[in-house]
Structure formats: structure tokens, C-alpha cells
């Protein structure tokens, strides 16, 4: 895939700003199953070469105030089919819509509780939500828990080291059907604040 992102900041007041974003690009799909070697040289007529570029665009808005934020985005505005006239199976990239918000609540000197909610809607699928609660100390160290409805939960942490933020997250399924699979993940994050 290849995309170009553009964002613009509108200062709405001294302490708040609206960020508007656009993205454009697309996904490249290429497969040549005829180049695979097989034990038997019997041809399969459904194995045809595929080379395709699917363009797409996306848009989003993010409003940030002193102690709260709200966001809305549609990263890919078009439904895109990945198929060919000779293929038996088709796949479709569906439009994902995200709506989110969060607040920073002061608890005591330098300690904040930061609850947030991200709602995800995909046509034809149940709506899901990520419910997150973080505790922040001096805006230097954050630790928290996130629950994705009917899917998973995660433990997260982030430490600020000057212009770098370093984080770790561990995610595990909560759905009984998924918990039998080894779908646990460990994630490391390195963010550079320019």
C-alpha cells in the first residue's frame, strides 16, 4: 500500500485546536500462482495471475481542548473489491467509521484519570467500542486498561523521555472462542515528538 497524508491545524482559541486530515493513495495487489512449483504438473484453471491497484481516499477531524478531545474519521471512503473475472473467491475492503472522545480528569497534584471511548462501525458487522482508562502521573508516566467489546482487553503503559515516548501493551482475547487460539500480542511503541 502507499498513501500520502495531509493535515491542517486550525487554532480555535488559545487552548484548543481543530485538526483536519485527508489521505489519498491505494493498495497494490499482485499474485502469480502459476509461478509456484508443484509436485504434480496438473494445471488449475482457477489459478490466474492478478495485478491490481485499488485507489482510495480518507478524511478525519480531531478537536483538542485543554482537558478533552473528540475525533471522527473514515480512513477509506470507498468499498473496494479485490477480485478478478477468473477468480472464484472475492474479498471486499469495507468502509470503517470511527468516532472517539476522551477527557483528562485531575485527581490530585499531577495525577490524572484519562477515560476515553472509540466507537467503530463497519457496514454489515456489529458496532464495537474500545473503552480505555489510563492513569497519568506528571504527564510522564501512564498506565491503564482497555477493553474492546466482545473481543479483547489490553494492559498499556507509556513513559515520556524528553522528545521520545516509549510504550508497551499486552493484549489478550476475552471471547471464549478466540481464547483457545494464541492471539495474545505484545506491542512496543516508540514515538518521536518533533
Where are these regions (language model features)?
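Subset of outer-membrane beta-barrel
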Residues: 1-194
Amino acid at each position: 500500500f502507499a498513501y500520502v497524508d495531509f493535515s491542517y491545524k486550525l487554532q480555535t482559541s488559545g487552548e484548543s485546536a481543530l485538526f483536519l486530515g485527508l489521505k489519498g493513495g491505494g493498495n497494490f495487489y499482485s499474485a502469480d500462482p502459476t509461478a509456484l512449483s508443484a509436485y504434480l504438473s496438473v494445471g488449475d484453471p482457477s489459478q490466474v495471475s492478478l495485478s491490481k491497484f485499488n485507489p482510495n481516499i480518507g478524511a478525519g477531524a480531531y478537536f483538542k481542548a485543554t482537558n478533552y478531545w473528540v475525533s471522527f474519521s473514515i480512513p477509506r471512503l470507498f468499498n473496494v473489491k479485490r477480485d478478478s473475472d477468473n477468480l472464484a473467491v472475492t474479498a471486499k475492503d469495507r468502509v470503517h467509521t470511527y468516532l472517539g472522545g476522551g477527557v483528562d480528569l485531575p485527581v490530585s497534584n499531577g495525577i490524572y484519570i484519562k477515560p476515553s471511548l472509540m466507537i467503530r462501525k463497519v457496514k454489515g458487522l456489529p458496532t464495537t467500542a474500545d473503552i480505555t482508562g489510563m492513569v497519568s502521573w506528571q504527564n510522564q508516566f501512564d498506565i491503564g486498561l482497555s477493553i474492546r467489546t466482545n473481543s479483547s482487553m489490553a494492559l498499556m503503559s507509556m513513559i515520556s523521555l524528553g522528545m521520545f515516548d516509549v510504550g508497551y501493551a499486552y493484549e489478550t482475547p476475552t471471547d471464549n472462542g478466540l481464547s483457545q487460539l494464541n492471539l495474545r500480542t505484545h506491542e512496543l511503541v516508540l514515538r518521536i515528538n518533533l
